[in-house]
Amino acid sequence: MRRPPLVVMAIVLLSGVAASTSAADTTTTTAVTTTTTTTITKTVPHRRVAALTGRPDPTAVTKRRSALTIKMDNTPQAHPQYGVNEADDVYEEIVEGGITRLAAIFNSNLPTIVGPVRSVRRTDREIVFPIGGVFAFSGGAQYAISSIETAPVTLIDQSNAGAAMFRDLSRPPPHNLFANAELLMKEGGRVHSPPPLFTYASRKVPAAGAPVGSFTVNFLSGFATSYQWDGKTRTWLRSIFGAPDVTATGVRVAPTNVIVMSVNYIGGVGVEGSYAQMVGSGPVEVFSDGRLQKGRWFRRNIRLPTAYRSASGKVIALRPGQTWVELLATGETVSVYARP
């Protein structure tokens, strides 16, 4: 872990920023027609493919910079958010009180406004350890900071970010801290390009699994998140708090893939100081290319990315694009609905 020297934070007041207010062991399903699965060939990202999305990277720009993970607020007061649609991958985790927060990982794009930015939690160490690079956050309790300090990342918070973090006074605190990803990346020191977190399928090979119209990740405390398949864009249209999830720039949040991992929260679900145990194995539901594959996730140690395998033991391959990973507590459910 490398942490830059502390400097006085420069607070930039952006009055012009828009201020619009805003898997599991048990799965509830309606009738979903299962089709014959086909083998998807495993592909490994090479120097012309972005490691964190599997998309073409003809200039290899993603190989010349580290990954940047920014901790984001996800409460109703934090919406609409900035920059989440430009992340390569996003992890959604449960924190105290059962609410969720996001860890958005940037490598392909470096938006000038990301946020709102919030504090670190112990689960973040589990997420970023194999990724490395830069981890940006607002601050945090000492136990959480001590945890993230053991990860191989450069830590940047509002005390040493300088102009890379700023407050929008048109929004109420603490939901008004934002970050400039490009400036944060410049504080990251030596480049450590990230490893691939997922296996991607060839576009020529049909997707495996049962066709799905929509599904809901049943987080507690009113944070249930729904996704609806859009065949035109081949993405999952995300909704939260009973409404479409739309960014502050008017873009619908629509990941290419959604992975729902069923994990144990050590210390209790929604309890302060608890964290998602992401080393070991557990049930997983993978939604990609309009289909669902059930299987298990495996992770041998914290330094390695998670592996995902189907019920038959085959590697689950994703469609290249943005991936969301939902860290659902063991015992919470996913409701799956057939296509109309």
Features from the language model and the residues they span:
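A surface/extracellular/periplasmic glyco- and lipid-processing/surface-interacting theme
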Residues: 32, 37-89, 96-340
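Bacterial N-terminal signal peptides that target proteins for export
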Residues: 1-8
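Bacterial N-terminal signal peptides
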Residues: 8-16
